[in-house]
Amino acid sequence: MDMMEQLSRIGIVPVIAINDAADAVPLAQALIDGGLPCAEVTFRTAAAADAIKNMTEAFPNMVVGAGTVLTCEQVDRAVAAGAKFIVSPGLNPTTVKHCQEIGIPVCPGTANPSDIEVALSLGLKTVKFFPAEAAGGLKYIKSIAAPYVDMKFMPTGGVNEKNLLDYLSFNKIICCGGSWMVPGDAVKAKDWDRIRTLTASAVQLMLGLEIAHVGINSTDEAEAMDTAAKLCKLLGWTMKVGNSSIFAGTGIEVMKSPFRGAKGHIGIKTNFIVRAKAYLERQGFEFDESSANVKDGQLKAIYLKDEIAGFAIHLVQK
């Protein structure tokens, strides 16, 4: 899996400035515990390289990159410290080419079609869009993305909990950079619990996990029809008959035959199923890959490998 795909599956890249390299490890731990094993450490401070080194040594699997990289010398320092990707506020062909020569993924900043065309000429398929909100926001990204069908964007600058979902819902955006989960005052106060809580809230906002429906197993279609009819009568819901199941409203799915789960199944809907799957895998859950429902190349649903309290659990794309 290439670096941009890893960032896409994480979804949010925390952009952080660290003044004391000793803060790097507890800050990284707070991000990981909150659900974001990723960070863009900006070269706006003298401690950046040491902070990256401390993070990558303590957490080798964390996706740590260097941001606000302006020169080839900074690229070399970041890579020597263990950075796995480079981000810059603007597009400097010299810096980009240097990254390409040494084999480090780079995501330079762009703000207009001319920048994008330079990026394309350099063979890039993903660029940072910066400063996102000040440069026109999602509306502007959509307007300039159309001619560049193969280009993906990582908007950064002004992205927050109020507009995150709008950005991520556009299929040309692979992830968003943001700092609202790592506010400067919390870092200065070494308030790692606050950062962990803000990070977890950002992840849950992004994924939007909630119960979609509960599945009830039946021995045959007649029993399923009887069960669904009674539930609809009880709740005043409408019945919808499908090939393998009958829905009572949208909250209960009655299977026409014995199905997954000793007691039935629970569907959990999410805003972004690929990101939700990756997140849950990082939490230690395993998936039954043979259960994946893929349509037009896009994952639509997939079951966990193990039942919980006798219920099979599956994710479903909203």
Ranges and model annotations:
Residues 89-95, 128-138, 172-195:
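Glycine-rich phosphate-binding active-site loops on the catalytic face of alpha/beta enzymes
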Residues 1-81, 101, 161-162, 189-204, ...:
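Conserved N-terminal beta1-alpha1 strand-loop-helix module at the mouth
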Residues 221-235, 276-284:
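Amphipathic alpha-helical segments
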Residues 5-17, 203-228, 261-268:
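N-terminal beta-strand motif that seeds the catalytic metal site of vicinal oxygen chelate
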Residues 15-17, 38-45, 62-70, 83-91, ...:
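Catalytic beta/alpha-barrel core
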Residues 32-37, 58-62, 80-86, 101-107, ...:
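Glycine-enriched alpha-helix->loop->beta-strand junction motifs that scaffold or abut catalytic
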Residues 27, 71-81, 114-122, 139, ...:
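Catalytic cores of alpha/beta
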